[in-house]
Amino acid sequence: MKEKNDTTIHSAVINRAISYIFDHVDEDISVDDVAKHCSYSKYHLMRLFRENMDEALYQFIKRVRLERSAWKLKVEKERSVTEIGIEYGYSSSNFATAFRKHLNTSPTDFRKTSEQLVEQSSFAHGISLDEIEDAGEQITIEHLEPMLVVYERKKGNYHNLSAEWCAFIEKYSDLATEDTLYIECTIDDPSITDENSCMFELCQTIARNHPALK
């Protein structure tokens, strides 16, 4: 049984389902599609998903789709609300209804207030949007060659990342070398997604010829 404070999603099949949903969230995917991808019966997968995620599989798909659309509304301001809704499988009226039901505001109003939502998020720790934009000027993008990693996908708020990293590095210290890279993937926007539903991944590169792989 999963410990109460354990944020790691341990089940391989659940991780496979989540990855599939993330990769195809802008397509018209169903629970049947996810189950087929995982080679599980629909009802068995639905039961496992709820046990591991405390959320119904269908609701997870719907939530991720709406929250990704909300993120697009924030960052792709040159695109219309209707265009973004259609990208995620909604007609104009259906998008507004589903969006309001989940986020308690209309897509149009959300876009207008998105900057304020960023600054109000507890994850922002009092940082203003101007400060965030200034920091963005110092960010560089580097393209890396494909690499082998050991990783853990976790669910929970981002406030304890330092402790999560310490535990992760200690757990996989036997796999580390002087060339090891540590990579963090924060998947959700905590100004949109409930903090306890946010996901992140901690990754550590591992040499392909490492003895542990033989």
List the model feature ranges, each with a label.
Residues M1-R16, E55-A56, K62-R63:
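Short, Lys/Arg-enriched, Trp-marked, Pro/Gly-tolerant hinge/linker segments that flank
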Residues D6, H10, D23, C38, ...:
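Residue-level marker of regulatory loop/turn positions in helix-turn-helix DNA-binding domains and
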Residues D6-T7, D28, K154, Y158:
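Short, N-terminal intrinsically disordered low-complexity segments that are rich in Pro/Gly
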Residues A17, A35-C38, S69, G85:
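Small-residue (primarily alanine) positions within well-ordered alpha-helices
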Residues Y43, L48, E55, Q59, ...:
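A solvent-exposed interaction/effector surface
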